Amino acid sequence: MEKIKKMKNSFNEHDTAEFISRIDKLTPTTNPIWGKMDVAKMMAHCNVTYELEYENIHPKPKGFVKLMLKLFVKNAVVGPKPYKKNGQTGSQFIIKDSRKFETEKKRLVDYLNKTQQLGETYFDGKESHSFGVLTAQEWSTMFSKHLDHHLTQFGV
């Protein structure tokens, strides 16, 4: 059974700084402890979580698909249980092309800062791309759990 660790708060300045400090420890040659992504693809993959909120570049699920996401995926994403290594991911999260390390790193840090600065009030009760309305806590968990999982994957 996987241990549930205390989740960082995506809206807390100190917790955001901790994430950025971990990101700063990555280099273009940092290798994963598990999985197939290189470090630039991993950061691009993490950026998708923020793109779904801030950019209008991913089609929104509709009808039956959205219902299935809310019923079967939402709790895994916004709940406290950690992700498993090598778990399944949505198609929009699969990064097939090569990415530039510095570009993806800057995007990720910018998204982290934007999220922290917008804060809990902005997100509380806001509709998400795939899961309907979320609480501020659910938004924070969604952002921080995914990022923590992949930073841990790369040993930082």
Where are these regions (language model features)?
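N-terminal leader/capping segments at the start of a protein or of a new domain
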Residues: 22-24, 31
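Membrane-proximal intrinsically disordered regions of secretory-pathway and membrane-system proteins
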Residues: 12-13, 109-110, 141-144
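Extreme N-terminal tail/first-helix region
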Residues: 1-22
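Short alpha-helical hairpin
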Residues: 16-21, 120-126
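Conserved, structured core segments of small domains
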Residues: 31, 108-115, 119, 123-124
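Short, helix-capping/interhelical loops that line the mouth of catalytic, cofactor-
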Residues: 2-5, 56-103
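Short, contiguous alpha-helical
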Residues: 29-78, 124-156
